[in-house]
Every structure is written in structure tokens, then in C-alpha cells.
Amino acid sequence: MKLSVDWLNEFTPLSQIPFEKVLEKINTSICEIDDVEEFKSHLSSVITVKIKSLEKHPNAEKLQTTIATDGSKEYQIVTAATNVAVGDIVPLALPGTKLDGKEILDSELRGVRSQGMYCSEKELGMALESSGVLILPKDTTLGISVRKYFLWEDTILTIDNKSITHRPDLWNHFGFARELASQLQIPLHHFPLQADTKWESGNQGLTVEKSEHAHAYYVCSIQNVNITESIPKIKSRLEKCGIRSINNVVDVSNYLLLELGQPTHFFDRSKLQSTSFTVSKSKEGESISLLDDTSPTLPNHILLIQNGETPVALAGVMGGKDSAVSESTKEIVMESAVFKREDVRYTIRKTNIRTESAVRYEKGLDSYTCLPVMKRAVQLLKENGNPNVKVFEPQGFNHTESKTVTIETNLSFLRHKLGKKISLHEVTDILQRLGFEVTTKDESLSVLVPKYRQNYDVTIPEDLVEEIGRTIGYASIRTEALSMAVETPIRNPLRELERRVKQFLALEVGFNEVYNYSFASPTDAKLEKEFEVTSLKIANEMPEEHSLLRNSLYPGLIKQTKVNQDRFEKVNLFELGRTYHKEGNDATLAQEKRWISLLSLSKCKPTDLSSIEDEFLTVRETISELFLFLNLPKFEWVKLPRTHFHPNASLVLLYDGKEVVELGILHTRFADLYDLKRRAILSKIDMEVLVQIWETYGRNSHFVPPSHFPQGQLDLSLIMNESDPTESFANLVKTLRIPELESVFVQTIFQGESVGEGKKSVTYRFILMSYDKTFTQDRFKELSDRLVETAKSNGYSLR
């Protein structure tokens, strides 16, 4: 947002305060300033001169030689302009001036000295194109800067919008001046909302139907309108704030927006089809032609202004083209309204149209200004080329006219929250300067919030603390050490466990942690079929891809993988996060579950099933190592199908009979849905179940000294059906309770012609360890024979 210091001075005497102090107070007590600049400072050396003589250039047919005077000094200027004549007053850029990035020089043009350059509107930044030198009125004072002539001598403050998004009262010059006056303790001496305007009796047939879709809505009829240019003051102020002048009626609407922050709109009455107005909502497929020459097709529930049955404006956003003010306009209808900020935000989001009016409405305006702004508009219309307008009584409604906000608090609360001892007199003085009405009894305060601050801004005692704190300056609050006792924090087992799991995944096995939004699309919600019915829709209107709270961490990991699959051969990701589920029809809160989910993207082609199975087993081994890292060795892998996994690659890890982990290869239909080019291996760990198991079995580590004897290993290759789970034989061996057996795992899996169609060769590796003696060849043979016998007796054949 841009603010004119000259305009602010109209309301409060900022010129009496050192400018550096004003800037400091804004930054420390009100908002951040992005930039401070002198408006069109590069034109300071462009002055007004009068052409005294004009002759043909002796050496160039298309050039002319002129003598111009600023009243005290003469300049010889060579020009190619054909629209200048003796006696014309024109702008002259003196040597050293920079226009369009080029410096004007005292130079010779075809042998004749030229001491500057006459300027067009384009070169002064007043128009995109111009056909010749700008000719100024005959009564223009000579020798003055064009900055002074066009009222451009001003300093412009660019305010960071984010820092005042909660302060709609500051989105205008009067509101900002009012705030500055209170902070700098200087008076306000101009009150535009107190304009003295008399209405003509009657309403000229206009009617407004009451509507629940607006806080307030008024219209009035204005006759004897003359369309012309705006006066210099209004044109220059609009330009300094980045708004192009249109005409003396439309400019008043824009001027009011910048002066008071209250949007208004003017309709050409001759173009209206009816005398009745109402605020309603659109129907699917309805269309309206807007001032920006677009005709959007509207969805349901867009807020509209209806004239009879015809939509004439997107309420709070933009007016319609068919009822716009034009050069032939003689009678207008003025609109002043306050719409619900939720409705305006919905319109912005659905139409992607954001205007200065919409920005202010979406912050939440109070309706008390609607009628005073109409009076101020009439005053400006009369000043701006329409002294004879007749304005008839406004028609409309105001649903929130009597709204008040009173906050009860006490001095001890304010002192405690501020961290500073402050007197009751000081508190009262600060709040009253800021426009609050304060009633005190002993140390209790009853504070009536001013109307321009009561909408979504100051509503609770903590807001008063902020008002006092920023006014006295946060730097004045002394820094003190914490006065509370330093105690050992309460142990949080879940946080401890999460830290250990993240340490293992990130540091031990090289997975990368990611963070994803907690929002999901309807498509994402269908990935884990068991959770689809528990999906929660976000109450606030959101784009479809973010319309639900996530019920699974998998979609976020898959989307991250999709982005990175062409950049990296190896993609191993994990995320620690919450999912949200509907607990029941009567539940008021969502059920939150905490998970760690993993994704490992295969490095192989989707058709290389043997290599993919090896990678799947590697991930399974990684999770097994995690449980050993957590001192939880007594786990069991069991085949259990999941709809989102491949039917032959879906496992769960059980511990003490409880399901803790699921692991599988993402089903091809989901891989295709998310455009994954390679197979993805997914897993998730239920952290709530895991922490219970870890607290019960894993926290107390027991040191087992290493054996003094070397370990041995046996490999056994078996032929089995392609669909047989590899863990079946491993689990069978564990039931033999061989005392020397430390672990068993799958070393390799092979498929090919040599093992037969529909078959696979699986090589198991058995790690053997004795703690009291060295293995002998006889014991190795005995164990090997026992394993072979077990395999054969259970239907497996040796390879």
C-alpha cells in the first residue's frame, strides 16, 4: 500500500515532527515500511519555460531552433516537435536530467547548440503514448519545476501489507493519520467523515430489498452530473498512489477508497433496467460483463448486486460494464455498502479477481461509515467539477449499526502480560489517545472499543495489552531472566522414540526426511481403502486438491517421489506426521494418529521383478534392523494383503501379537494414478503401538558380551512356487529352536528357465554362533542335514 505524506499532512501536522522520528514511530509502533521515496524526484530539473522565438534549423529540415525563457534565463533548444509555437509554455528538461534511463546533455545537434529538451506527456510518465510536446496553460508560472506544477512534490511511503492485514482501519490515509496522531501525540484537524451534506427530499423511486448477505447496503440518486477531468489535486493524489485518473466521477470513488478505506461505486442510472436493488448470490453458469472487459461464468454462491433481475456488479469486487459511468452520463446512482468478508474472499478465490475494493472488504470493514462516506462523496463531487448536483435521500439497510464491543480487564492482568509496571493513569491515557473509551473502578477497567477497531481486531484483553505495548514501545520493557525454577522436564517417551527412529533412518541407513502439508485431495483419501470412510472435509472452502485432512502419509511421499524420480536414481524418503480421522458421528474433534511412513523407489525397470523383490527384501531388512536398534528382537513378519499393495508383496510386522508395521510394493493402479515410472516400496510404523511395546520391552537394554568363538554360516537354496512367501521356511526353521542359530534371512532370489515356470530359487543364509566352544565339521554337517531334512519334509526341493 502506498501512502502520500502530503495527504497525511492534510489530517495531522506531521510536518511539525522530524521526518526521521515519524518513520521510526511507524516502524516501531504501527507497521513495517518497505520503501520511502520522493515521487518523481528525477523530474526536479524539468522546469516550465515560454518559447520566445522559433526558426528553421539551418542544417536540418525536420528540426527547429527555439529560444525559451524561464523568466530570468534564456535557453537555446533544438527540437523536432511540430506542435510548438511562439508563446507556448512547455516543460524543459535541463542538462543532467535522466528520462527513460537516458541523461539529457548540453550538446550540439547538426551544428547548433541545444541546452535541454522539451518534454511530452510520455516522457513525464503521464501517458503511454503522446504525439508531441506537452503544451501547458497560458497562465502557468515560469521557472517552476513540473513536480511543483503537477503537485508531485511529495514523499511516498510503501507499507508492507502483511503487517497491517489485521488492521483494516489503516488501509487508508485518514485512518493512518489518525493512528499516527495518537502515537505522536499531535492533533487531528480534518475529519472527512463529518462532511456537512444536505439530502434532497425523496428517493427518486429507488428501493433496496433487505438481505442477509450484506452487513449494510445503501444507494442514492444523484442528478445534474457533468463528466469531465478531475481537478489537479485529486488527479495527482491518485497517481501518487498508483491509480490512473478516469474522470471526475469515477475518480471520486477511487479517492474515497484511498482517503477513508470505504469502497463505493457509481452506476449510470440511464443504463439501469430497474429502480430496485438487492444483494443476492449467483446460480451455476450465470455470467456478468465486468469493467475489465471480462465476462466470467460464475459458480454457485458468488455475491452479486442485482438491479431488478439483472446482475450489475460482483459485490465488493468489481462493477459491471453495462452500467458503467461514461462521458454521456447525466444521472448516477451511488452505492455504499459493507459485505461479509467471507463472501468477498469466496468471490476472489473462485473468480481469481482481486481489486483494491476486494482487498479492503476481505479484511472486515465496519458498516458505521456507509452513510458518512456518501456525504463525503457528495462533497468531493461538488469540489471536482459538479457544483450543482442534486443528491436524494439514501435508501438501504444496516444490520450491524448498533454493534458494540466492550472488554473487561484489570491493571494486574495488563502488568503481568506486559512484564512492566505501568500506572492506571498511563494505561487510561494511552487507550483514550487510541480512540478507546475507558471507565475505571479501583484497578478494574471497562474499555469500549472504537467502531473502526471492533471487527476482528480488538476483541479480548490480550489485544489491549498489545495496544499498550506497541505504544510505549517494546524496547522500553526491560529484559529479565526467567523467575521460574529450572526443573528436569517431564519425560516424553513418544518424543524419545521418534528421535531414535529418525536418527536410525537418517543417519544409519541414509533415508531423507520430508515434511508435507496435512491437506489431501479426494483421490489421496482413497489410497488406503480402510481409512476412506473416516476422511474429514475442511470446513473452510479450499481447492479440491487440499479439501480434506490427510488420512495417510503415503500420498505426500508418493508426490515427493514423483517430483524427484527423474533427478535421482536412488530415492529413499520418510516422514513423521499425523493423520486425521472421523472418530464417530457424535465426535466433536478428529482422531489423530501418529505414524512414520517410508518410501523407497526401485532403481529397476517395473518389469524386472526379481531385482524389485531383492529391493523389497532390503527394505524389510532395514525395518528389521530398526527393531534390533530399538532392542526389540522378538518380531515376526507375516503375510497380510492390503488393497493398496501388490497381492504378493504385502507384509505386516507383529510384536507380542500386535500389528506395528506394514510393508508392501505399491499396487500398479496407484503407481499409474500418480505417474510413478518405477515401483515404489512403502511402509508405515504405528508410533502409538510402537511406543507401548518399546516402553514394555525395549527401554532396558541388556548387554550380551560377544562370543570368543568365530561365527559360522550356512547357505541353503530351495525351489518353491513363485507365490510362496519367503518367510514361511525361515519361520519353520525358527520352530526347530537350534541353540546356535543367531539369525536367518534371504540372501538371493532367482527366477528363470533353469528353475522352471512359476517357480523361484530362494537362497537362505543361516548365521550360527556358539558361546562356549568352536564349531566342528561334524556339528556343521549335523545342522545342514537337519535343515535339508526339514525342507524336504515340508515340500521344498533343493536346487
Swiss-Prot record:
Binds 2 magnesium ions per tetramer. One of its GO terms (biological process) is phenylalanyl-tRNA aminoacylation. Its EC number is 6.1.1.20. Residues 40-147 form the tRNA-binding domain. GO terms for cellular component: phenylalanine-tRNA ligase complex. Belongs to the phenylalanyl-tRNA synthetase beta subunit family. Type 1 subfamily. This is Phenylalanine--tRNA ligase beta subunit. It comes from Leptospira biflexa serovar Patoc (strain Patoc 1 / ATCC 23582 / Paris). The gene is pheT.
